[in-house]
């Protein structure tokens, strides 16, 4: 039998702002109204300020572990902006901006990281799950929530966030495989900052892109510039 090609594929990468912050009028025109842009910028500024306060609290011994969101504000906010209010937002620990946009008060973030369980007492109508600290577990939760919505005939999805290091966890593969096989309406949003805790991305994953891992499960996949809210 001759050697044949079983699969060829490509992964698109979307970026509306270039590396100098210049806006592509052709690609980005009318994506976000000006009034909304101002509100989104205010929310990113609030997230950055909370980060500064929380970091000082942590360094002064008044707060335990606190993972900073600095530099990753745009990605969770952009996702939260385009989701419907009843879609599930299933986060880990660097999505403060998306949580603010959905309506979670900043003080609840601080309560959570200071060990006060009232920080996890989230209003049901916000459709937000408690912040997941164990690496990767939230992906299974999101898959289950989206599966339940599909079973009930609801027109809603779940969007779950995780870092590149989480793609080496078993929970990631279980969730992806289950979601793909049952055609579950869930978005797996990988925030690749090229560090798996203290391990560089090039060491924890030898694939050229994290996005290509979705191809193995028969899923659609795309790369977006995580610092570009238009993307």
What is each residue range found by the language model?
Residues 14-21, 42-55:
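N-terminal glycine-rich anion-binding loops that anchor highly charged ligand groups
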Residues 16, 221-223:
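Conserved beta-strand scaffold positions in the cores of enzyme catalytic domains, especially
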Residues 49-52, 56-182, 200-206, 211-218:
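Cofactor-binding active-site loop characterized by glycine-rich and histidine/acidic residues
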Residues 161, 188-189:
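Residue-level marker for buried hydrophobic side chains located in beta-strands
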Residues 185-187, 220:
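Short, proline-centered helix/strand-breaking motifs
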């Amino acid at each position: 039998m001759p050697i044949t090609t079983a699969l060829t594929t490509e992964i698109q990468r979307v970026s509306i702002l270039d590396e100098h912050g210049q806006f592509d009028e052709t690609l980005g025109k009318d994506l976000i109204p000006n009034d909304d842009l101002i509100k989104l910028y205010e929310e990113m500024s609030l997230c950055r300020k909370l980060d500064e306060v929380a970091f000082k609290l942590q360094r002064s011994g008044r707060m335990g572990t606190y993972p900073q969101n600095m530099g990753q504000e745009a990605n969770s906010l952009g996702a939260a902006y385009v989701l419907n209010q009843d879609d599930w937002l299933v986060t880990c620990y660097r999505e403060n901006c998306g949580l603010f946009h959905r309506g979670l008060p900043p003080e609840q973030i601080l309560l959570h990281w200071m060990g006060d369980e009232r920080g996890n007492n989230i209003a049901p109508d916000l459709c937000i799950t408690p912040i997941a600290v164990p690496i990767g577990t939230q992906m299974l939760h999101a898959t289950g929530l989206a599966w339940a919505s599909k079973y009930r005939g609801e027109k809603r999805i779940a969007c779950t966030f995780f870092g590149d290091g989480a793609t080496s966890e078993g929970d990631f593969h279980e969730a992806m495989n289950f979601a793909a096989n049952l055609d579950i309406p869930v978005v797996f949003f990988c925030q690749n900052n090229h560090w798996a805790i203290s391990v560089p991305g090039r060491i924890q994953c030898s694939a050229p892109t994290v996005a290509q891992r979705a191809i193995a499960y028969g899923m659609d996949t795309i790369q977006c510039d995580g610092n570009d809210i238009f993307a």
